[in-house]
Amino acid sequence: MIVLRKTARDRRRLAAARSWQILISAASGVAATLFRALADENVNVDMIEQNVSSEGHTDISFTVPRTDVTKAAHCMEKIVVDTEASGFRTDEQIGRVSLVGAGMKTHPGIAAKMFETMATEGVNIEMISTSTIRISCVVAETDVERAVRALHAAFQLED
């Protein structure tokens, strides 16, 4: 069985609106408010990551196509005011590296090997998203090609 088919890279279309902190405890409905505002502006949201801190703040990070950054920033400015959030920041110097293959869910250790390979190469992972056939990592745009080459070597994939 082939565990991995390929790596994928995406440098040109991503930007991230990151570290959006809500200063409201029990922030029920905040994600709905945020993503409704983005949807109403036709902003296509890709990877989403949410964490709740021990202090009760919510931190939501997500990626959008670079073409949607201005619209997303406008939405975020309004959301910050409406929800009394602590603010937000964007990072347009990111890319996504993914491992793709049908055997992901049945072969333990794929994620560990991916993350170890990237760590050995000095590639810092900023976000992680998984599905049954894909592991995707957001990394600095300058690290994308190096990460892809290292993953190809580690998993013995063809170019």
Annotate each predicted stretch with a short phrase.
Residues M1-D159:
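A conserved regulatory-domain signal marking ACT and ACT-like small-molecule sensing domains
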